[in-house]
């Protein structure tokens, strides 16, 4: 883990981190310290922790008992927590279009960039390492001179070069995404690049060798040992033992000798090598390491010939292994490329060209072009001829997956390479199997009598290397990615001591608690007061969409289950929206302002979803309809006045007498002007009381709230929060989409199927409502529940279970539940199989081991005749 506090970054790869003054680093999975790691004791009991042990070892007393310890031991880092505050660093994002993008700055990548630039193309080259050259940069002074010459040539040709910038994904429509470690004022930059042509020149990964105890500290890839020596002047050991199955081991030996590092010997799996041995270095051909010695560091190795007759004990403080090369085909595969197995070279290489994508150099399996020695081709037999020696042979060094785990997966029939990956966690660490995959595929093939192409590879997915969430998010964090919306009357609610909560990305008052009141107590008081006098509620977040055009009425008939084209001007109607599967996804009131203009209300959290659905159908299916859809939620505020004294309050405020209940009917809309402000007043109610929804320009919302509050003091007005509204709508049995519905709810389940058969016009989802499953008489239906004892509140989520109870078939579940202050007893809504035919029946609902007796009742619970919402109470 790197950094402290809010800058802490977990699970970083040490080999990717450049040393710098002030660097803070700590081990990710050593406890209590690296010097004494209790987790290392697990190595003494390998039989207890085989592949998939968590599925079969800890069966008692239960997984939850072991889970915390196992997760802590898994090696995961610790991210910055809530107590450390927000990340203080800045992240940038840049979009760019070029003709040619070259991913990789080795010799092959530089040559490809130069050729493209000389052809007159705009070229961008990105290299993940801090310097260009790849493998060639570590080949002594001559190699660095060649890289410098190519870099100068690229600059002269006009190639734009960025080092420390890794292309980590190729996506559809020629999109490449890269991440750059910037430093200074910007920590990381995300690049989004559209290129007409992309050249993949990512080189190749060196493979480790497989031998017992190959996880000891000091066992390293030979190319890494060479790069440390050549590029940073760091000797990874004073006496280095080289083991290889290809000629690159000999080149590393020469480089180490030139740097003054003693080379103990070269252990070559092969009987012959094209490269000459450095002078004075013993070479053990047709031999293999069968044991690495040492505990906290390597002290030596045991080498045995393939014939079993020769044995050498070699002292060394570093073992450098060169098991051959694996082309870095990740980006090519992400773009849809298929791989083929090159038997001669024992590697997977690109099978064919892709439109707009070229693969060059070692990445294409062309080791000569990639300046990797031509004979670096490991023998598949050498990979699998391990014999059985004491000690674990690790295939994935980061996730501690051994060859015995691969064998176990094969025995337990996890033969698919994807199953092997997930069962053993092979290739699931931060390197995503870049060094381990081919060795594992060869081993699995040996255990299942299959060739590597028959075993296949796992699917390569972005990102190519670990990328921080911060880099992907860029500046889109906090309220920049999810703005917390404040209502136009926010300050008025603050002055009333509103208790704010987030509802569908809006900051809204849940209630207005008085001194010593809980949220529930405040909601009960407010609900009761609204029923007695009058309440003020701001409904500005309510979704508002204007739909207009010559075909607007016909279009809404297609969108809604109900018929909207028959609405008269000034009329309003409740409607539900369903998707192609017939599932209810929103509801609201539609009012007609003119023959070709409609005012559409949706739920507060569903307005974007509804607007997008309207646009999708207009643009993709109903393209001939002359209709415009305009979301106007933020442009209009909403002040809802409801209760027996609602009209008295509006009358005191001087609003038009045409709004009086005796003149303006329920579910009608009037457009008026009051005090110079244009208003759209809708007679509607979500709480069962006489109600007026006053829609007005958002900037005038607080003015109206303050005026009505001032006048309402003589009428015992009360501010009403969301919780009180939920109590009152439950008393009326009104539907709350998303609360009382789920992804299976159809119109018939909530009693909204009346009139469908008579509706002449087609509508979205109609055919789905004719499927056998939709017509099943056993479907769940929305009904009311009351506790038999009339005292116990039924928990939301409690399940109705068929007699004699759990674990019997589930018959339904409670969706809404509140204590009714008006009725003096708890009431609930529930989805229940054949619910409407079971009114009067007693059922039992179960929640967390407790059973509750309930009675199925019809809704509404309160004012069943609807006298109050018509102003007749």
Where are the language model's segments positioned?
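Short amphipathic beta-strand starts and helix->beta connectors
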Residues: 344, 378-381, 525-532, 577-587, ...
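Acidic, proline/glycine-enriched N-terminal capping motif
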Residues: 439, 446-578, 583
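Short acidic-hydrophobic surface loop/beta-edge motif
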Residues: 1, 176, 500-501, 575-578, ...
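Residues forming the flavin
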Residues: 1-484, 635, 849
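Well-ordered mid-protein domain cores that form the structural environment of catalytic cofactors
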Residues: 565-596, 601-617
């Amino acid at each position: 883990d790197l950094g402290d506090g809010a800058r802490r970054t977990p699970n970083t790869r040490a080999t990717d981190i450049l040393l710098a003054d002030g660097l803070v680093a700590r081990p990710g999975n050593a406890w209590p310290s690296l010097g004494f790691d209790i987790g290392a004791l697990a190595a003494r009991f390998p039989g207890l922790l085989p592949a998939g042990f968590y599925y079969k070892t800890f069966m008692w007393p239960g997984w939850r008992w072991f889970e915390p310890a196992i997760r802590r031991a898994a090696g995961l880092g610790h991210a910055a927590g809530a107590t450390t505050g927000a990340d203080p660093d800045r992240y940038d994002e840049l979009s760019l279009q070029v003709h040619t993008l070259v991913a990789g700055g080795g010799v092959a990548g530089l040559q490809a960039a130069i050729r493209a630039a000389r052809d007159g193309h705009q070229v961008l080259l990105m290299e993940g390492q801090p310097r260009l050259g790849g493998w060639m940069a570590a080949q002594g002074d001559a190699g660095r001179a060649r890289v410098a010459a190519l870099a100068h040539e690229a600059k002269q040709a006009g190639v734009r070069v960025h080092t420390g910038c890794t292309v980590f994904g190729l996506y559809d429509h020629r999109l490449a995404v890269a991440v750059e470690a910037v430093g200074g004022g910007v920590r990381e930059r995300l690049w989004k690049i559209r290129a007409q042509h992309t050249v993949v020149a990512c080189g190749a990964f060196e493979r480790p060798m497989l031998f017992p105890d190959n996880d000891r500290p000091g066992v390293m890839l030979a190319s890494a040992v060479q790069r440390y020596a050549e590029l940073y002047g760091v000797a990874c050991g004073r006496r280095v033992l080289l083991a290889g199955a290809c000629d690159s081991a000999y080149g590393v030996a020469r480089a180490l000798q030139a740097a003054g590092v003693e080379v103990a010997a070269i252990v070559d799996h092969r009987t012959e090598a094209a490269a000459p041995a450095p002078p004075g270095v013993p070479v053990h051909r047709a031999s293999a390491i069968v044991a690495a010695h040492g505990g906290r560091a390597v002290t030596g190795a045991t080498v045995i010939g393939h014939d079993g007759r020769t044995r050498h004990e070699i002292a060394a403080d570093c073992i450098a292994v060169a098991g051959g090369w694996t082309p870095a085909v990740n980006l090519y595969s992400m773009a849809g490329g298929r791989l083929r197995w090159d038997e001669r070279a024992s590697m997977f290489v690109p099978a064919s060209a892709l439109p707009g994508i070229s693969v060059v150099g070692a990445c294409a399996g062309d080791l000569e072009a990639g300046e990797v020695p031509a004979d670096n081709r490991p023998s598949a037999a050498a990979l699998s001829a391990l014999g059985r020696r004491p000690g674990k042979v690790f295939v994935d060094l980061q996730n501690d997956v051994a060859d015995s785990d691969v064998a176990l997966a094969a025995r337990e029939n996890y033969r698919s390479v994807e199953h092997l990956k997930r069962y053993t966690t092979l290739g699931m660490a931060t390197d995503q199997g870049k060094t381990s995959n081919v060795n594992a595929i060869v081993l699995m093939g040996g255990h299942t009598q299959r060739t590597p192409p028959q075993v296949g590879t796992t699917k390569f997915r972005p990102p190519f290397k670990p990328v921080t969430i911060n880099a992907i998010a860029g500046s889109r964090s906090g309220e920049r990615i999810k703005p917390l919306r404040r209502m136009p009357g926010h300050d008025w609610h603050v002055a009333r001591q509103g208790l704010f909560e987030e509802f569908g990305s809006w900051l809204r008052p849940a209630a207005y608690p008085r001194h010593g009141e809980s949220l529930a107590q405040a909601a009960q008081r407010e609900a009761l007061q609204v029923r007695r006098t009058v309440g003020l509620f701001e409904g500005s977040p309510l979704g508002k969409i204007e739909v207009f055009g010559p075909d607007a009425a016909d279009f809404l008939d297609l969108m809604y289950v109900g018929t909207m084209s028959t609405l008269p001007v000034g009329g309003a109607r409740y409607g539900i929206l369903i998707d192609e599967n017939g599932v209810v996804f929103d509801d609201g009131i539609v009012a007609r302002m003119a023959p070709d203009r409609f005012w559409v209300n949706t739920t507060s959290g569903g307005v974007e979803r509804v607007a997008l659905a309207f646009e999708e159908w207009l643009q993709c299916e109903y393209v001939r309809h002359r209709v415009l859809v305009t979301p106007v939620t933020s442009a209009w505020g909403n002040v809802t006045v409801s209760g027996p004294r609602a009209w008295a309050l509006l009358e005191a405020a001087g609003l038009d007498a045409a709004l009086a209940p005796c003149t303006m009917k329920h579910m009608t809309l009037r457009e008026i002007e009051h005090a110079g402000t244009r208003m759209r007043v809708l007679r509607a109610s979500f709480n069962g009381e006489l109600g007026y929804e006053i829609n007005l320009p958002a900037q005038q919302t607080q003015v109206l709230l303050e005026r009505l509050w001032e006048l309402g003091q003589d009428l015992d007005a009360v501010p009403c929060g969301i919780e009180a509204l939920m109590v009152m709508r439950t008393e009326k049995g009104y539907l709350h989409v998303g609360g009382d519905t789920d992804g299976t709810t159809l119109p018939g389940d909530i009693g909204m199927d009346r009139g469908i058969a008579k509706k002449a016009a087609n509508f979205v989802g109609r055919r789905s409502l004719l499927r056998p499953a939709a017509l099943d008489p056993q479907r769940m239906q929305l009904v009311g529940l009351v506790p038999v004892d009339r005292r116990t509140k039924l928990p939301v989520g409690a399940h109705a279970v068929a007699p004699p109870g759990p674990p019997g078939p589930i018959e339904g579940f409670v969706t809404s539940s509140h204590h009714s202050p008006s009725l003096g007893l708890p009431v609930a809504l529930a989805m229940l199989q054949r619910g409407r035919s079971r009114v009067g029946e007693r059922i039992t609902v179960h929640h967390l081991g407790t059973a509750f007796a309930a009675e199925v009742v019809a809704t509404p619970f309160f004012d069943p005749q609807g006298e109050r919402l018509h102003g007749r109470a």
